[in-house]
Swiss-Prot record:
Homotrimer. One of its GO terms (molecular function) is enzyme regulator activity. GO terms for biological process: nitrogen fixation; regulation of nitrogen utilization. Keywords: Nitrogen fixation, Nucleotide-binding, Phosphoprotein, Transcription, Transcription regulation. Belongs to the P(II) protein family. This is Nitrogen regulatory protein P-II. It comes from the Bacteria. P-II indirectly controls the transcription of the glutamine synthetase gene (glnA). P-II prevents NR-II-catalyzed conversion of NR-I to NR-I-phosphate, the transcriptional activator of glnA. When P-II is uridylylated to P-II-UMP, these events are reversed. When the ratio of Gln to 2-ketoglutarate decreases, P-II is uridylylated to P-II-UMP, which causes the deadenylation of glutamine synthetase, so activating the enzyme. GO terms for cellular component: cytosol. Coiled coil: none annotated. InterPro entries: N-reg_PII (IPR002187), N-reg_PII-like_a/b (IPR011322), N-reg_PII/ATP_PRibTrfase_C (IPR015867), N-reg_PII_CS (IPR017918), N-reg_PII_urydylation_site (IPR002332). PANTHER family: NITROGEN REGULATORY PROTEIN P-II, NITROGEN REGULATORY PROTEIN P-II HOMOLOG.
Length: 112
C-alpha cells in the first residue's frame, strides 16, 4: 500500500477529484493548507499599505491505495492539476505498513 499526498491549487480540486473518480478511486481526504515554494509569495495593497503575503492558499489531497494503482493515480493527479505555471504543486508517495478500518477491524487492502 502507498499513501499519495498531493499539494495543489485550490481551484483544481474538482478536476483532480473527478480524474481520480474516473480511474476508480473514491476515498480521499482533503485539507486546506497554506505554503510556498519557488514562487515565494506576492505583495498586496490593503488600506494604502503594502503587505507581503508569504503563504499562498493550497489544498492537500491524501489517499491510500494499493501499489498497482499508484502510477495511474499519479498520472491522473498530475494531468488534472497542471496549469503549466509556477505553483502547480507537488506529489509525494509514501509506503504504508498497515491500514485498519476502525469500524470492522479489517486490515490491509480490505481496510482501504
Amino acid at each position: 500500500m502507498k499513501k499519495i499526498e498531493a499539494i495543489i491549487k485550490p481551484f483544481k480540486l474538482d478536476e483532480v477529484k473527478e480524474a481520480l473518480h474516473e480511474i476508480g478511486l473514491q476515498g480521499i481526504t482533503v485539507t486546506e493548507a497554506k505554503g510556498f515554494g519557488r514562487q515565494k509569495g506576492h505583495t498586496e495593497l490593503y488600506r494604502g499599505a503594502e503587505y507581503v503575503v508569504d503563504f499562498l492558499p493550497k489544498v492537500k489531497i491524501e489517499l491510500v491505495i494499493e501499489d498497482a494503482l499508484v502510477e495511474r493515480a499519479i498520472e491522473a493527479i498530475q494531468q488534472a492539476a497542471q496549469t503549466g505555471r509556477i505553483g502547480d504543486g507537488k506529489i509525494f508517495v509514501y509506503a504504508i505498513e498497515e491500514a485498519i478500518r476502525i469500524r470492522t477491524g479489517e486490515r490491509g487492502g480490505d481496510a482501504i
